[in-house]
Amino acid sequence: MLPAQHKLNSSMQFRTVMRKGRRAGSKTVVVHLWDSAESLDGTEKQGEVASFGGPRFGLVVSKAVGNAVVRHRTSRRLRHICASIVEKSPELLSPTHHVVIRALAGAGNAPSAELERDIRYGLGKTSRVRTNK
């Protein structure tokens, strides 16, 4: 599945990604992406969010998705998609990217191909560099 080095594992890490990151939504998921390399300005604690070992993922699957069986199945499918993105598409994310994927109510019934398409769309949209004109 998803190795420990690719997981967000504290509420502070989730909070940082959700508050400081960019987000893109679709019918089934909302993708929050935060690049720790461009956001660290010296005012934060160094240990707040680890930025080594590759991109890190966190999942939020609420009761809106369905009962416990549906939520756990959805979580397993999302973890598998994240692992395949890390393995097969390393150009999509840098090692300093931290991603939180929030499953919406439609994610429980959506096919895996649709979930993967929506996650890739969200990652592509949030990882684009913004330019000020």
UniProtKB/Swiss-Prot annotation:
Belongs to the RnpA family. Disulfide bonds: none annotated. The lineage of its organism: Bacteria, Bacillati, Actinomycetota, Actinomycetes, Mycobacteriales. One of its GO terms (molecular function) is ribonuclease P activity. GO terms for cellular component: ribonuclease P complex. It holds the Pfam family Ribonuclease_P. This is Ribonuclease P protein component. GO terms for biological process: tRNA 5'-leader removal. It is an enzyme of class 3 (hydrolase). It catalyses: Endonucleolytic cleavage of RNA, removing 5'-extranucleotides from tRNA precursor. Consists of a catalytic RNA component (M1 or rnpB) and a protein subunit. Keywords: Endonuclease, Hydrolase, Nuclease, RNA-binding, tRNA processing. InterPro entries: Ribosomal_Su5_D2-typ_SF (IPR020568), Ribsml_uS5_D2-typ_fold_subgr (IPR014721), RNase_P (IPR000100). Its EC number is 3.1.26.5. RNaseP catalyzes the removal of the 5'-leader sequence from pre-tRNA to produce the mature 5'-terminus. It can also cleave other RNA substrates such as 4.5S RNA. The protein component plays an auxiliary but essential role in vivo by binding to the 5'-leader sequence and broadening the substrate specificity of the ribozyme.
